[in-house]
Amino acid sequence: MGEHAKGETLSVAFAGPGQHQDAGAKMIHMAPHTQSSIVSKSIARGGGRAGYRGEVRIDANAHHSANTVRCDALLVDTISRSDTYPAIDIRVDDVQLGHEATVSRVSEEQLFYLMSRGMPEDEAMAMIVRGFIEPIARELPMEYAMELNKLIEMGMEGSVG
């Protein structure tokens, strides 16, 4: 790709019991004024392990380029795990680069709040997870977003109780 090229990667990984899901992305800037973004979301439950491996490289002639990386993990229980392995290689000094990573756990308070409004625990958990992946789902065509929500709900079956 040449000058002013743009790239975007969106990924969702779901790690259930006995699973280790490893997602990742690579963005390589080789020309000036290029832009890229990576957004990765992972969900782990039942002792599942979710990982993200990402690489961003900005070559010496890729002046005035920009990249953002955002990795978010949601742990549904206390026995699941998430790991992030970013690799950043910048070979020029007039670029913008941002990297954020968060790991959060579904809290008892979140569940209590929704359940106190009459929602069953399994539906409350599913709503929290759907809210977590919503930033990616809204970027997808409607039929893919619906399929993603169905897959998440299938993966969440049996997560409560």
Briefly describe each language-model feature range.
Residues 107, 127-134:
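Small/polar glycine-rich anion-binding or flexible loop at a beta-alpha turn
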Residues 1-119, 137-161:
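Conserved beta-strand/loop scaffold segments within soluble protein domains that form the structured core
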